[in-house]
Swiss-Prot record:
This is PTS system lactose-specific EIICB component. Residues 480-583 form the PTS EIIB type-3 domain. One of its GO terms (cellular component) is plasma membrane. It holds the Pfam family PTS_EIIC. It is found in: Cell membrane.
Length: 583
């Protein structure tokens, strides 16, 4: 098994390179930017259709009123994602351009959204256009429009093919003329694609693309498809790479299209049978975080004998319950630990197999409601499937099965840690024997016991003003310092940000920390003096360094165990911040 892990680690640089691909990153960040709209729209699905489970049905008129906010937000999510994806890709291209000759992201957003309408919207005789492909059905086309837009803009801006205005003209006016050529080229190219599609295929580009990828959508929902997809999530995380950065962009269009399809099936009184949805990923495959680790901290607390394992379990329970499982991933550790390779990969796959059985055989409705990823897994299953009876059973079954999968491997690991603890105890006993040969053992024990009591008292009591002053004097941070901690979604980064803020207040150090998600940081990073990358986004260090160097901001990345230790020791976290400014 150790040889397998070593072989896997050799491929890590290749997978990290894929995870940093600017087009995959743009897709993922584009979706992240649109999540507030998706979450807002899901509220109205809950209000409209959950009462059906309890025998209450809204009238058609009332249903239409309640669903209007959904239709006017989620119904145009393709249009919105075209703009947000273009914005993210523009940021990536701008890193490679001269700082005095940047692509205007507002212009690329508008051009991408306009181009999307050409490719996805059909005109109607009465005026206006149809919106059938402006929602999740048009997501693939949204990516096409965004990519074409930014590539064309980059071609023009990089070569200075623009209308140049005199220096006396205000910058905002000059920017308008600078964008005319690339914007015009984008619209002409996309309009040409639209004309070709309607002339030779007799349909819009969005529908044509959907037809091409339809077999892939169907295959992805099959047994082999779900095995490969959700196995990949866990595999990449196991080798220390943020799996969603690679897998999510590849399946994003499928998951959100399936979510809307399931809702449409429920509205029509039919069985919602699409398996791959955001809910399947967040609450079934990664229940409690990647690796289906919801049960693992509880098992560490209650089913192990090692003091170390019990302590790790207690420290990891709360964050893992809300899907933030880095404390157990790196604290145990689970990632790159040969003992946990099989359960970490296998548990998510088995969870999805069981879920698929419930949907295909027991006819439970699949997910039709989008919920925040921090929703506890069992609650997410119940709410996301509309409070169906089988969803309660499914949640219990998954918990039991995950315990059964992890248990034998946990016992093996616990024995390993116990052996280490026994070894340390033997070393301590040997040292004590050497001491007794030269000193009065009782007297030495009394001294050690007194020292231990004093240490305990010092640890448990609040620091005095003198102690605070002494500790503060050792820290060279005298001016207000803002620290931004970045992770993939904002949950893990909150652990370190909270630890820093608490320690800064306790030791009276002028440090303020905030948590953020990588990809949503570009517009706010200028307000910080230091950016810390959590382990899950540490592979992006070289990319973001181009931005921090330009702005004169310090940048630091962390490793798994190091990061978890910093979240648990506020003073060490402050020292880490200070060290970055001493380099």
């Amino acid at each position: 098994m150790n040889k397998l892990i070593a072989w896997i680690e050799k491929g890590k640089p290749f997978f990290e390179k894929i995870s940093r691909n600017i087009y995959l990153r743009a897709i993922r960040d584009g979706f992240i930017a649109a999540i507030p709209i998706i979450l807002f729209s899901s509220i109205f699905i809950l209000i409209t259709y959950v009462p059906n489970v309890f025998g209450f049905t809204w009238s058609k008129t009332m249903e239409g009123i309640l669903m209007k906010p959904y239709n006017y937000t989620m119904g145009i999510v393709g249009l919105i994602v075209a703009g947000t994806t273009a914005k993210s890709l523009t940021d990536s291209y701008n890193r490679k351009l001269d700082k005095t000759n940047q692509i205007n992201f507002i212009s690329t957003m508008m051009a991408a959204m306009s181009g999307f309408l050409f490719l996805a919207a059909d005109p109607i005789k009465e005026g206006g256009f149809l919106s059938a492909f402006m929602g999740t059905k048009g997501l693939l086309t949204a990516f096409i429009s965004a990519f074409i837009t930014v590539i064309v803009y980059n071609f023009f801006i990089k070569r200075n093919i623009t209308i140049k205005m005199p220096k006396e003209v205000p910058p905002n006016i000059s920017q308008v003329f600078k964008d005319i050529f690339p914007l015009s080229a984008v619209i002409i190219i996309i309009y040409a694609l639209d004309l070709l599609s309607r002339t030779f295929i007799h349909t819009n580009v969005a529908n044509a693309v959907l037809k091409i990828f339809e077999p892939l959508f169907t295959a992805a929902d099959g047994w082999i498809g779900v095995t490969l997809i959700f196995g990949a999530f866990a595999f990449f995380w196991f080798v220390g790479i943020h799996g969603p950065s690679i897998v999510e962009p590849a399946i994003a269009a499928i998951t959100y299209a399936n979510l809307e399809t399931n809702l449409n099936l429920i509205q029509a009184g039919e069985h919602a049978d699409k398996i791959i949805t955001p809910g399947t990923q967040m609450f079934v495959a990664t229940m409690g975080g990647t690796g289906a680790t919801l049960v693992v901290p509880f098992m560490f607390m209650w089913l192990t004998k090692s003091k170390r394992n019990k302590a790790i379990g207690r420290a990891s329970v709360v964050p893992t319950f809300f899907g933030v499982n880095e404390p157990i991933l790196f604290g145990a550790p689970l990632v790159l630990n040969p003992v946990f390779f099989i359960p970490f990969i296998f548990a998510p796959i088995v969870n999805v197999w069981i879920f698929k059985f419930f949907v295909d055989v027991l006819k439970m409705n699949s997910f039709s409601i989008f919920l925040p990823w921090t929703t506890p897994g069992p609650l997410g299953i119940v709410m996301g499937t509309g409070f169906a009876f089988w969803s309660f059973v499914l949640a219990i079954v998954l918990i039991v099965v995950d315990v059964m999968i992890y248990y034998p491997f946990l016992k093996v690991y616990d024995e390993q840690i116990l052996e280490e603890e026994r070894g340390n105890k033997e070393v301590n006993n040997e040292l004590k024997e050497k001491v007794s040969a030269n000193f009065d053992t009782k007297k030495a024990d009394a001294i050690l016991a007194t020292a231990g009591a004093n240490e305990t008292t010092t640890t448990e009591s609040a620091p005095s003003d003198e102690e605070v002053s002494a500790k503060n004097s050792s820290n060279s941070i005298n001016e207000q310092t803002n620290v931004l901690v970045l992770c993939a979604g904002g949950g893990t980064s909150g652990l370190l940000a909270n630890a820093l803020n608490k320690a800064a207040e306790e030791y009276q150090v002028p440090v303020k920390a905030a948590a953020g998600g990588y990809g949503a940081h570009m517009d706010i990073m200028k307000d910080y003096q230091l950016i810390i990358l959590a382990p899950q986004v540490a592979s992006n260090y070289e990319d973001i360094k181009q931005d921090t160097d330009r702005l004169g901001i310090k940048l630091a990345k962390t490793q798994g165990v190091e990061y978890i230790n910093l979240t648990r020791d506020g003073k060490a976290a402050l020292d880490f911040v200070q060290q970055q400014f001493e380099k």
